[in-house]
């Protein structure tokens, strides 16, 4: 019994130490010295989850009516059964509408035949304007912690690594709270909560600014934002069952 108590205490201490190391300013951006998040098994993938009755369905497999290319033109990605598939090198896509505070749900499947490693293995992202939740194959594929799957890219590693193997459907359920500005100054940070495969991996985290690579940048005033799915020019990642709920 005593050994079980000691083991539980040690695990709790490790979790606290990891949480303290997650703050964006605790390490240089993209530092490989940050602790890796603990790995958890999220369980098997289930069937596509139905959208709530008050949701706006952004993609149900039937077409790209709610989407446009990165330049406002036609979507350059493919339709495959009930999913959309990235055409590597064709560019990002984005929603036609702009949104404020929202809950966004989507499912994605990574390429099981990807030849890459680290950041070059099924890399993509879900953007709320300038703020990114990373999409990556992080199943037995180490990389810098603030760039792995379900990281708030360049800022917060996930609380745990809840990745499934590539080739299996995975899900993100994300709550985005927009920053508040007064006279061009951010008086409230943007916040993100993320569930990866139904596991809490980001808990209402305050962002220190927009997403960037290798540098940190400050907030710039903006209004409602488009949801953007990234073409990182790596692999033919698939997305399906995308819906959004506006939060009042």
Regions found by a protein language model. Give the residues of each.
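Bacterial N-terminal signal peptides
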Residues: 1-9
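Carbohydrate-interacting regions of secretory-pathway proteins
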Residues: 13-248
């Amino acid at each position: 019994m005593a050994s079980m108590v000691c083991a539980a205490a040690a695990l709790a201490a490790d979790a606290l130490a990891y949480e303290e190391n997650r703050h964006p300013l605790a390490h240089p951006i993209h530092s490989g010295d940050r602790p890796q998040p603990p790995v958890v098994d999220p369980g098997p993938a289930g069937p596509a989850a139905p959208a709530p009755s008050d949701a706006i369905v952004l993609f149900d497999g039937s077409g790209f009516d709610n989407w446009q290319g990165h330049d406002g033109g036609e979507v350059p990605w493919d339709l495959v059964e009930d999913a959309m598939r990235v055409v590597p090198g064709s560019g990002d896509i984005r929603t036609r509408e702009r949104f404020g505070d929202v809950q966004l749900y989507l499912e994605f499947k990574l390429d099981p035949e990807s030849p890459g490693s680290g950041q070059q293995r099924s890399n993509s992202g879900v953007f709320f304007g300038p703020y990114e939740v990373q999409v990556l194959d992080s199943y037995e594929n180490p990389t810098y912690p603030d760039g792995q799957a379900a990281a708030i890219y360049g800022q917060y590693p996930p609380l745990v690594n809840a990745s499934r193997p590539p080739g299996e459907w995975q899900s993100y359920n994300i709550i985005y709270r927009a920053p508040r500005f007064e006279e061009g100054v951010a008086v409230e940070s943007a916040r993100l909560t993320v569930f990866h495969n139904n596991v809490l991996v980001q808990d209402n985290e305050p962002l220190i600014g927009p997403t960037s690579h290798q540098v940190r940048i400050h907030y710039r005033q903006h209004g409602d934002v488009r949801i953007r799915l990234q073409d990182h020019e790596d692999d033919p990642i698939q997305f399906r069952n995308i819906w959004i709920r506006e939060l009042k």
